């Protein structure tokens, strides 16, 4: 019997949003869901049409990471904490990907989106979940970006990543 391939079967593996990606902070989770949606949009876009979608994704990721870093600084993390360093490394790599795409490697955006889809769950479940728990513990409202009690923030700055698995 001959079976036909449907378009869904030829679409790249998309990154599903699952409850396991929730961090416990509604605003962070909303931003993360947008991040996942944009990865899926890239993977569903033909390679020759990906650059504008990727540029929008890069801009979103810059703001996504800046948002988390504002929260870190507002709640006692040092500016050079390892969570922010992870963000900087990802953004540097994403910028290099754009340059390679323009220099004729039309598959690199797809490869980057696939790599981010693999990386992101671990990051969300460790560093971001740790940050969300920290924000909650100090009474930080991520919607208003305010502290219920500013005295809850200690004078000592944290240099770790916010994860229970990072010092």
For each of these PLM feature ranges, what is it?
Residues 2-167:
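Small-residue-biased structural context
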């Amino acid at each position: 019997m001959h079976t036909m391939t449907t378009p869904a079967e030829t679409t790249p593996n998309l990154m599903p949003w699952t409850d396991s990606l929730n961090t416990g902070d509604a605003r962070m989770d909303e931003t993360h869901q947008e991040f996942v949606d944009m990865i899926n949009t890239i993977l569903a876009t033909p390679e020759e049409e990906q650059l504008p979608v990727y540029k929008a994704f890069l801009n979103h990721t810059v703001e996504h990471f800046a948002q988390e870093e504002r929260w870190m600084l507002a709640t006692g993390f040092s500016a050079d904490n390892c969570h922010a360093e992870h963000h900087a490394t990802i953004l540097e790599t994403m910028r290099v990907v754009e340059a390679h795409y323009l220099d004729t490697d039309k598959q690199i955006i797809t490869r980057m989106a696939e790599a981010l889809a693999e990386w992101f769950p671990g990051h969300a479940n460790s560093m971001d979940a740790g940050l969300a728990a920290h924000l909650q513990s100090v009474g930080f409202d991520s919607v208003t970006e305010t502290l219920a009690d500013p005295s809850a923030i200690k004078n000592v700055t944290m240099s770790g990543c916010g994860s229970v698995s990072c010092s």
